[in-house]
Curated annotation (Swiss-Prot):
GO biological process, alphabetically ordered: L-threonine catabolic process to glycine; protein homotetramerization; threonine metabolic process
Temperature impact on function: Optimum temperature is 90 degrees Celsius. Extremely thermostable. The half-life of the enzyme is more than 2 hours at 85 degrees Celsius and 24 minutes in boiling water.
NCBIfam families: PRK05396.1, tdh
Protein name: L-threonine 3-dehydrogenase
Residues that bind Zn(2+) 2: 97, 100, 103, 111
Originating organism: Thermococcus kodakarensis (strain ATCC BAA-918 / JCM 12380 / KOD1) (Pyrococcus kodakaraensis (strain KOD1))
Length: 350
């Protein structure tokens, strides 16, 4: 194994990132070193790349970016008993304390002291990466690395879609970015019908149809509320899944959901949002879920089973694959322009 490796690093508090050469790290107690087989870009990585207000408040350069990963264990640190060299793993990227009030009530996904790979510590946009053994998830040997790397964001989509009953229920999804596309795949695999997607990008509307959306609408050209009402004979949808983080999409979705329906919110809004709670939520008796992270480890079992079932239509979602990191800037700029689904790097070019 080489002593040096390439990594995409946030080297300074400014727009962009750099491809650097650094030492291959050594695992400490309770840690393993993985050879990164595949790693995908998340919206969080894009925020860090763009150096928005959230990134400025959270990230401390220099730091290796990235957290969605599939890899092979190549070295085991002291005290690790459940993993060995050669194990094929993905990683739960939220490192929880296990001691806070939430953790002691089995709500690990909302641990009050959560640390995140590639956010609070070095990440996985590299040839090799250190991960805590307790955060490893063993993958079936025949799972493609690009699928295995997507399990972490798929967990977000699964928790959003499956926060309540979905089979046979009319569903509106706002936002067909990478997470929204995963949400469409999960909703269709879980029996939702019809699945209606509101998305302004023509590129992503076409992707949504490929993944399985029954109807798509451009909210900049048509009123999505009227669109939904026409399809549902005026009833509105049973389920509203918000992936966009757009305040207007939230308002439209709340208007389009039927009284007594269910709402799951995953998209992060850029600012405080003003909503008519009385008329859009309280008087409609809506069931509203805020979604963050993944339930440990129930969601991982669900995600793995869905992938192995063959029912998830993931191939159209993975629109760009890169061997190595040489074109990482191109990948990020395409994502910024909304011209991708999921982007996956395969760090080892061979």
């Amino acid at each position: 194994m080489a002593e040096k490796m390439q990594a995409i690093m946030k080297t300074k508090p400014a727009y962009g990132a750099e491809l650097v050469e650094v030492d291959v790290p050594k695992p400490g107690p309770g840690e393993v070193l993985i050879k990164v087989l595949a790693t995908s870009i998340c919206g969080t990585d894009l925020h860090i790349y763009e150096w928005n207000e959230w990134a400025q408040s959270r990230i401390k350069p220099p730091q290796i970016m990235g957290h969605e990963v599939a890899g092979e264990v190549v070295e085991v640190g002291p005290g690790v008993e459940d993993l060995q060299v050669g194990d094929y793993i993905s990683v739960e990227t939220h490192i929880v304390c296990g001691k806070c009030y939430a953790c002691k009530h089995n709500r690990y996904h909302v641990c009050q002291n959560t640390k995140i790979f590639g956010v609070d510590m070095d990440g996985v946009f590299a040839h090799y990466a250190i991960v805590p053994a307790k955060n490893a998830w063993k993958n079936p040997k025949d799972m493609p690395p690009e699928y295995a790397a997507l399990q972490e964001p798929l967990g977000n989509a699964v928790d959003t879609v499956l926060a309540g009953p979905i089979a046979g229920r009319s569903t509106l999804i706002t936002g067909a970015g990478p997470l929204g596309l995963l949400g469409i795949a999960v909703a269709k695999a879980s029996g939702a019908y019809p699945v209606i997607v509101s998305e302004p990008s023509e590129f992503r509307r076409k992707l949504a149809k490929k993944v399985g959306a029954d109807y798509v609408v451009n909210p900049f050209e048509e009123d999505p509320v009227k669109f939904v009402m026409d399809i549902t004979d005026g009833a509105g949808v049973e389920v509203f899944l918000e992936f966009s983080g757009a305040p207007k999409a939230l308002e439209q979705g709340l208007k389009a959901v039927t009284p007594g329906g269910r709402v799951s919110l995953l998209g992060l809004f850029p600012r405080e949002v003003t909503i008519d709670f009385n008329n859009l939520i309280i008087f409609k008796a809506l069931e509203v879920h805020g979604i963050t992270g993944r339930h440990l480890w129930e969601t991982w079992y669900t995600v793995s089973s869905l992938i192995q079932s063959g029912k998830l239509n993931l191939d159209p979602i993975i629109t760009h694959k890169y061997k190595g990191f040489d074109k990482f800037e191109e990948a990020f700029e395409l994502m910024r322009a909304g011209k991708t689904g999921k982007v996956v790097f395969f760090p080892h070019k061979g």
